[in-house]
Curated annotation (Swiss-Prot):
<feature type="modified residue" description="Phosphothreonine">
    <location>
        <position position="222"/>
    </location>
</feature>
<dbReference type="GO" id="GO:0005229">
    <property type="term" value="F:intracellularly calcium-gated chloride channel activity"/>
</dbReference>
<keyword id="KW-0963">Cytoplasm</keyword>
<dbReference type="GO" id="GO:0005634">
    <property type="term" value="C:nucleus"/>
</dbReference>
<comment type="similarity">
    <text>Belongs to the pICln (TC 1.A.47) family.</text>
</comment>
<dbReference type="GO" id="GO:0006821">
    <property type="term" value="P:chloride transport"/>
</dbReference>
<feature type="modified residue" description="N-acetylserine">
    <location>
        <position position="2"/>
    </location>
</feature>
<comment type="subunit">
    <text>Component of the methylosome, a 20S complex containing at least PRMT5/SKB1, WDR77/MEP50 and CLNS1A/pICln. May mediate SNRPD1 and SNRPD3 methylation. Forms a 6S pICln-Sm complex composed of CLNS1A/pICln, SNRPD1, SNRPD2, SNRPE, SNRPF and SNRPG; ring-like structure where CLNS1A/pICln mimics additional Sm proteins and which is unable to assemble into the core snRNP. Interacts with LSM10 and LSM11.</text>
</comment>
<dbReference type="GO" id="GO:0005829">
    <property type="term" value="C:cytosol"/>
</dbReference>
<keyword id="KW-0597">Phosphoprotein</keyword>
<keyword id="KW-0206">Cytoskeleton</keyword>
<keyword id="KW-0507">mRNA processing</keyword>
<dbReference type="GO" id="GO:0034709">
    <property type="term" value="C:methylosome"/>
</dbReference>
<comment type="function">
    <text>Involved in both the assembly of spliceosomal snRNPs and the methylation of Sm proteins. Chaperone that regulates the assembly of spliceosomal U1, U2, U4 and U5 small nuclear ribonucleoproteins (snRNPs), the building blocks of the spliceosome, and thereby plays an important role in the splicing of cellular pre-mRNAs. Most spliceosomal snRNPs contain a common set of Sm proteins SNRPB, SNRPD1, SNRPD2, SNRPD3, SNRPE, SNRPF and SNRPG that assemble in a heptameric protein ring on the Sm site of the small nuclear RNA to form the core snRNP (Sm core).</text>
</comment>
<keyword id="KW-0007">Acetylation</keyword>
<dbReference type="GO" id="GO:1902476">
    <property type="term" value="P:chloride transmembrane transport"/>
</dbReference>
<dbReference type="GO" id="GO:0008289">
    <property type="term" value="F:lipid binding"/>
</dbReference>
Length: 236
């Protein structure tokens, strides 16, 4: 096929993990011949006896697995799915309508590597896993990034950026207006009365029911006594 090219086989400089001779390559059901499969850290390559072959970049490989299902293929093999077109079908002309229909369809090619020694399949699969792990999907990395607003350091140094201001509790109090402080004191008083009322309900309040109680801001209680207010609706 036209996409087969001549190139030197991967070596130690490419991080060669496994070299499997007598391996047949099949692309989308069409046999490419028998050659040597090279599983290296940099790429996956296959070369036939004449030195012609192809290489696959790991970021384009979406799936690899050992297939032992005779209904899928008569021989056990290493299955590799690639998000790209290869061979003559990659050069087929498309009409405008075909191009529109294919905009949302990602190209896919299926490779099958069939070694004469089927016992080598596990080693081939393991080498593929190790090399694939060295090339994580960029989209997966982007999804782990923080998606909030970014602080532009350069803009700030030039006096063009705004820095969000954060205060501690004490610093926040110092920035309150007189009206704001009065409102805060009123809210704290209401909270204190609410907590006091809650723990004097039914005339029961024990030292064990309170770990800390300072200005009505931090309270921890023991579980409700069985039979008392278990069916009460409480708005928080």
């Amino acid at each position: 096929m036209s996409f087969l090219k001549s190139f030197p086989p991967p070596g130690s400089a490419d991080g060669l993990r496994l070299q499997q001779p007598d391996t047949e390559a099949v692309l989308n059901g069409k046999g490419l011949g028998t050659g040597t499969l090279y599983i290296a850290e940099s790429r996956l390559s296959w070369l036939d006896g004449s030195g012609l072959g192809f290489s696959l970049e790991y970021p384009t490989i979406s799936l690899h697995a050992v297939s032992r299902d005779p209904n899928a293929y008569p021989q056990e093999h290493l299955y590799v799915m690639v998000n790209a077109r290869f061979g003559e079908e990659s050069k087929e002309p498309f009409s405008d309508e075909d191009e529109d229909d294919n905009d949302d369809v990602e190209p896919i090619s299926e490779f099958r590597f069939v070694p004469s020694d089927k016992s080598a399949l596990e080693a081939m699969f393991t080498a593929m896993c190790e090399c694939q792990a060295l090339h994580p999907d960029p989209e997966d990395e982007d999804s782990d990034d923080y998606d909030g607003e970014e602080y532009d350091v350069e803009a700030h140094e030039q006096g063009q950026g705004d820095i969000p201001t954060f205060y501690t509790y004490e610093e926040g109090l110092s920035h309150l207006t007189a009206e704001g402080q009065a409102t805060l004191e009123r809210l704290e008083g209401m909270l204190s009365q609410s907590v006091s009322s809650q723990y004097n309900m039914a005339g029961v309040r024990t030292e064990d029911s309170v770990r800390t109680y300072e200005d009505g801001m931090e309270v921890e209680t023991t579980p409700t006594v069985a039979g008392q207010f278990e069916d009460a609706d409480v708005d928080h």
